[in-house]
Design a protein with these regions (language model features):
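A compositional/structural signature for long, glycine/proline-rich flexible linkers
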Residues: 29-476
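N-terminal Sec-pathway targeting helices
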Residues: 4-21
């Protein structure tokens, strides 16, 4: 059917008008501005989460030793649990008045049984701390002073001698006057840890070593009168601190950074920490975190912990089956390395002591007490030390001693009655069961898998230069 031209024109106008109305309505519903706003919100959330994650990982690695130290300081200067192993108020010493055995090791991992331990937590925010050391008449002792950044300085035979001495622990910015004959020792942070060791040469020496250890004491400068203080300190009960693995880590890091001076070269890094509320120029409030920020920081905590754990398991180059780490106590800007070391504990500077460790024999097999082993030192292979050396065996699963029939947990150059061959060489017998002939050179080992740790106190330069290595561990 054909329509008149006039009707066709009217129909086209009607259709076009309807289409125009439809498109106008569609455009009104489409509103590109709302789409742009929605996409921008997603972008902002992604940026916030990513920034929190990436900066959070850096902050966690950087702050790991600080929070480990401040948490331990709180937990060992307050009563935080029943039957607490270690407790002493700030600026006081706790003394382990016994050699370490399987029954007395407590929470110590791979402890030595050659020295008496003593420790304390210092706070010199208000004033220096006096440290008194007695005349040990040449006896080996050392005090490792560890800052919150895990950097170490030493007092002791190697560094300051064995005559009676007075020291004052001071911050780099302290500018007061010390009494006569008091030597300043500068530590980077106003809070930190003291860990001391006093050599015991045998059971008959135990009482004298304890008496010398008792003569090491601490006293704030304002109370100093040349004598140890008998002032009683009230014990304080508190909740145990454990911030690792939680957002509380960042809150504690923020509080701690506010108390510390800016380290050279770290201004830009800490400015980044400010961006997520962790740096020293802002205040961290977990309740003010946006959901994307919280998600990013929680992800950062998990990944940073995994990074630290993986870093501790990186293979250390071994020679003759012995692994020797000499990169401890001074870290600079190597934050991941610092965190990985702290994960396993705090150590002395290598000039003070080195700890070659082994879990494999010369053929690459795990050490196990079901077998017998031998370590032989030719005369020229005997450990070159200015202090002393010893060898200990620990259960592999927990780094603890295992009881044995002769209560011997280390053997070394101070062990009474060692038998050397006619050329001056030394053979150590490592086995679980008592030897049939003689026990003079016997180091009892755990029944199952175990690790060996050799301790070299005041190692000579050829050890530090890698010119000396321990002999291989021979399976018999």
């Amino acid at each position: 059917m054909r329509y008149p031209a006039k009707q066709t024109t009217q129909w086209l106008k009607l259709v076009l008008g309807s289409l125009i109305i439809f498109f106008i309505a569609a455009l009104m519903l489409f509103n590109p501005a709302s789409l742009i706003t929605s996409q921008q919100a997603k972008n902002d959330a992604l940026i916030a989460e990513s920034m929190a994650y990436h900066i959070g990982v850096s902050a966690y690695l950087y702050g790991y030793p600080l929070i480990d130290m401040t948490s331990q300081m709180h937990n060992e200067t307050h009563l935080v649990e029943d039957n607490q192993d270690v407790y002493a108020p700030v600026n006081k010493l706790y003394r382990f008045n016994h050699l370490i055995t399987p029954q007395t090791a407590g929470n110590l991992r791979a402890p030595n049984s050659d020295t008496l331990y003593f420790q304390g937590w210092y706070d010199i925010t208000q004033q220096p701390l006096i440290i008194h050391t007695p005349d040990t008449q040449g006896r080996y002792f050392t005090i490792a002073i560890t800052s919150l950044y895990a950097e170490v300085v030493h007092i002791g035979r190697r560094t300051t001698g064995t005559k009676e001495r007075l020291f004052a622990l001071v911050t780099p910015t302290w500018s007061g006057t010390l009494p006569d004959k008091v030597t300043p020792i500068v530590t980077e942070t106003s809070k930190g840890w003291l860990l001391g060791r006093m050599l015991v040469t045998g059971s008959e020496d135990f009482v004298q070593a304890n008496q010398l250890m008792e003569q090491i004491w601490l006293q704030p400068l304002g109370e100093f009168n040349g004598q140890p203080s008998n002032k009683k300190t009230e014990k304080i009960n508190a909740q145990k601190y454990d911030f690792k693995g939680s957002l509380g880590f960042f809150a504690e890091l923020n509080r701690t950074l506010k108390t510390l001076p800016l380290r050279p070269g770290e201004a830009a890094l800490l400015a980044q920490f400010d961006e997520i509320g962790v740096g020293p120029n802002v205040t961290f409030d977990v309740d003010l975190l946006t959901p994307p920020q919280r998600k990013g920081l929680e992800h950062a905590i998990k990944d940073a912990e995994d990074i630290i754990q993986a870093s501790t398991q990186r293979s250390i180059k071994s020679t003759n089956g012995w692994m020797i780490s000499k990169d401890i106590g001074v870290y600079g800007y190597r934050y991941m390395h610092r965190a990985s070391v702290v994960k396993g504990g705090y150590g002395n500077l290598p000039e003070e002591s080195l700890y070659p460790a082994a879990v494999f024999d010369e053929n690459g097999n795990l050490l196990n007490g079901s077998d017998r082993f031998r370590v032989h030192f030719n005369p020229e292979q005997l450990p070159p030390v200015d202090g002393f050396w010893s060898l200990s065996a620990y259960k592999l699963e927990d780094a603890q001693f295992e009881p044995n029939s002769i209560d011997r947990y280390s053997i070394g150059n101070l062990t009474k009655g060692l038998t050397y061959n006619e050329l001056g060489g030394l053979t150590l017998d490592l086995q679980h069961e008592m030897p049939a002939d003689t026990t003079t050179n016997w180091l009892p080992i755990p029944e199952g898998h175990f690790m060996l740790v050799m301790r070299l106190y005041e190692p000579k330069q050829n050890v530090l230069d890698n010119q000396w290595i321990p002999p291989s561990i021979e399976r018999l």
